[in-house]
Amino acid sequence: MISLTKHNELKGYKSLDVYPEVAHFVTTRHEGISTGAYGSFNCSPYTNDSCMNVNRNQSWLFQCMNHQIKELFIPEQSHGCASLIINESFFKESLEMRRLLLRGMDALITNVPGYCVCVTTADCVPVLLYDKKQHVVAAVHAGWKGTVKHIVSNVMDHLNKMFGTQGEDVIACIGPSISLESFEVGDEVYDAFEESGFDMSLISMKKKETGKYHIDLWEANRIELPVSYTHLRA
């Protein structure tokens, strides 16, 4: 990853940075005004953080961007596999209806310039997609539950059906998230991945010391992408 700001508050990817028509970023915890559990750069409205803090953090984010951002859209995620297209039909809705439409979404898609689609993650995997031919972007929240439900491949299918996206035209970036070494799971989670059709020899290991399984969410989502290694960045 590369730094997009002087003090590393925002991170990014070389593979996306070469496309001046698209803005992207990965935030860190630093440089915001939130405190306590939300310290300090919390931009999510779906927390107990104050609206003032969230708005000021988002304003600072806009100032850091090299693009003119009209509005930031963050879904109220549910660890599912539903996605929403942010388009002219969405903009025609009332503010209350927009909030309702964002509820339960774990991926946002848009091809409308000036609008930023986001997801929020901690351990879960953020996946950024850019179709450099159709000029469509997507932000995907792939927690283990969403990964089991094949959220990334579902979003790719959605992009193909709605915009004609082809895998070879997509830049895919996997963001900071829990590693194979750290993601210890119980048998029920292991079984959920196996029952969902994943080749467990590719995405899991069993530690001799603990007898516990570990799952590689990065690899699980990578193999869901019809994208070559040359287009994929983690």
Give the predicted meaning of each segment.
Residues 1-232:
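Active-site microenvironment for binding and transforming phosphate-containing groups
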